[in-house]
Design a protein with these regions (language model features):
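PEST-like low-complexity, intrinsically disordered acidic/proline/serine-rich tracts
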Residues: 1-215
């Protein structure tokens, strides 16, 4: 389950129209932010704009993580009822159709032995000093969407890079932190970086799938 300890006003409630604080948007993005109208998204069947891969890990909710096969990790969200697939051992196919979750190429960082084929240099340069298990995921082929529910945009040219670091507390609680880096040459003048924490629950009894909401 996601543990929200920061950015409460942007994550736990729908931000006010025009509130893009802390996101490095440019003038073109500002026009879209100021024109946001959730009714238009609903009428167009685009309620899931804020549930695409660049934003979904910031949406409060629960995850189900399982292996679809030896080279594909499946991540399901109850918020928005979304499914992400992390593909090991390859790159995004040319000419793939854009979707909310895009195509995610994954690899374990150097020194990690796990399922999935190892790869080199999917995204940013390898980090140093990380002791926990680290998974790197690079996502492209995205449909344009929102970084926040109030219409802060990202474009179809966005590249999403994520690092997943798993660790165990002395109490035995299992956690992971995902560092999310959104690079968008259309609407951001520098990459937008966040970190988000998740804690493992005892079972899946609190899972509550909900549809996307534009409001």
């Amino acid at each position: 389950v996601s543990v929200v300890t920061e950015d409460w006003r942007w994550r736990m409630v729908t931000p006010l129209k025009g509130d893009a604080a802390s996101i490095p948007i440019n003038a073109e993005a500002r026009k879209i932010v100021d024109a946001w109208d959730p009714a238009k998204d609903e009428a167009a069947g685009l309620q899931c704009r804020a549930y695409g891969a660049p934003a979904i890990m910031r949406v409060p909710g629960r995850l189900r993580i399982s292996w679809l096969n030896d080279n594909t990790l499946k991540v399901e969200t109850d918020a928005g009822t979304q499914t992400r697939l992390f593909h090991f051992g390859g790159q995004a196919p040319a000419g793939g159709k854009p979707t909310w979750q895009g195509y995610s190429a994954a690899r374990w960082e150097a020194g990690q032995a796990a399922r999935g084929s190892p790869g080199l240099g999917l995204g940013l340069a390898p980090r140093e000093g990380t002791r926990s298990r680290s998974l790197e995921v690079v996502t492209t082929q995205l449909s344009p969407g929102y970084l926040r529910k109030n219409g802060v945009p990202y474009s179809g040219r966005t590249t999403l890079t994520e690092y997943y670091d798993r660790f165990t507390e002395p109490t035995g609680e299992e956690w992971f932190t995902v560092t999310t880096i959104v690079a968008d040459p259309v609407y951001l003048y520098i990459p937008f970086v966040t970190t988000t924490d998740f804690k493992k629950e005892r079972d899946g009894s609190r899972w509550h799938a909900t549809p996307c909401s534009a409001r």
